[in-house]
């Protein structure tokens, strides 16, 4: 079974290569919980639980935006968690407008899978 460090490094490498949804699908546990600081556009709740709801949240987000550029610091691993600092440019698919977006993401790993992802941004 992969360690938290193994998961963190592979997951982060996938993100760096633009494989955002594939990284989630590879590592999300069936009972994953995803936590945002606020509700998302499209009626997506700030907290969703389960792999189906988390995939739907991800598909909704990537349906409205694309990541044009990303710089990731980390992973910073402690115990069963790892954190990433992500600095990116996201582009609205409808308007074509881009903006800088920074976030901290904290992931909890159990049995080689991500059981919680928690995002911090304003």
Task: List each language-model region with its residue ranges.
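Hydrophobic/aromatic beta-strand elements that line small-molecule binding cavities or substrate pockets
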Residues: 69-76, 88-89, 102-108
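Short beta-strand edge/turn micro-motifs at domain boundaries
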Residues: 102-122
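A solvent-exposed, acidic/Ser-Thr-rich amphipathic alpha-helical stretch
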Residues: 6, 21, 25-79
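Short beta-strand segments enriched in hydrophobic/aromatic residues
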Residues: 28, 88-90, 105, 120-121
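Short, cysteine-centered beta-strand-loop-beta hairpins and adjacent loop/turn segments enriched
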Residues: 64, 90-100
């Amino acid at each position: 079974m992969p360690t938290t460090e193994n998961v963190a490094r592979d997951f982060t490498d996938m993100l760096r290569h633009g494989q955002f949804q594939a990284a989630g699908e590879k590592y999300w546990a069936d009972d994953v919980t995803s936590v945002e600081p606020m509700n998302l556009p499209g009626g997506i709740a700030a907290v969703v639980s389960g792999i189906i709801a988390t995939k739907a949240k991800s598909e909704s987000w990537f349906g409205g935006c694309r990541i044009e550029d990303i710089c990731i610091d980390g992973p910073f691993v402690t115990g069963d968690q790892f954190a990433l600092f992500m600095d990116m440019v996201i582009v609205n698919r409808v308007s074509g407008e881009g903006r800088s977006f920074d976030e901290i993401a904290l992931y909890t790993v159990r049995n080689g899978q991500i059981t919680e992802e928690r995002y911090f941004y304003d």
